[in-house]
Amino acid sequence: MSESREQEQALTLAVIMQSVQCIREVARTGDTETSRYEPLIEGLLGEYDGSTDALYGAARLAPGLRRVVEQLEDPQEADTTRYVASIFHLERRLMKRQAVLQRIAEGIEQARSQADYFENPAHTSVIRSVGDLYSQTISEMGPRLMIRGEQQHLENERNAALIRALLLCGIRGASLWRDNGGGRMTLLFRRQAIAGAARDLLEALPTEA
């Protein structure tokens, strides 16, 4: 399908929202659905050709699109707002660090090779590699983003790696948002148009999405 500018922006926000949703679930419960984070990892490892739908699949971003509508029309969750704002902040800082960007590009290429080898982008080894990449790059820029949740879940190595990987997925979404004309003022002045675009995308999906 051919997306409008607002639909592209809605999809990039859905990437961020879905990443945040998964992060919150892992931090609070120790688990999240693979079907929700797998497309985020696939999109992180994939090549962007100008279509967020082609990279992620709008149907697989349905949970994120629903969150876009909820947060833009009637924001209720302060934690979600905080995480999203922090992800945008990290992305802006990252864009000023060419050496870090290069290191991330190299790490993504290595993770892509792993995903191809295991034929599974959500394989534990891939998640661990992407999580380590976040630690070695974004975390080193400081200060670190504080994740709220149950300590027993946050201290679990698998959960910690997945949370870091999802943060990098969210930053990728923020980069795509910027590539599609999104900025600080866009959410202020175009929030209803973007929420409407997210609704249109959801209505166009199969009912089982």
UniProtKB/Swiss-Prot annotation:
<keyword id="KW-1003">Cell membrane</keyword>
<dbReference type="InterPro" id="IPR007451">
    <property type="entry name" value="HflD"/>
</dbReference>
<comment type="similarity">
    <text>Belongs to the HflD family.</text>
</comment>
<protein>
    <recommendedName>
        <fullName>High frequency lysogenization protein HflD homolog</fullName>
    </recommendedName>
</protein>
<keyword id="KW-0997">Cell inner membrane</keyword>
<dbReference type="GO" id="GO:0005886">
    <property type="term" value="C:plasma membrane"/>
</dbReference>
<dbReference type="Pfam" id="PF04356">
    <property type="entry name" value="DUF489"/>
</dbReference>
<dbReference type="GO" id="GO:0005737">
    <property type="term" value="C:cytoplasm"/>
</dbReference>
<dbReference type="InterPro" id="IPR035932">
    <property type="entry name" value="HflD-like_sf"/>
</dbReference>
<keyword id="KW-0963">Cytoplasm</keyword>
<keyword id="KW-0472">Membrane</keyword>
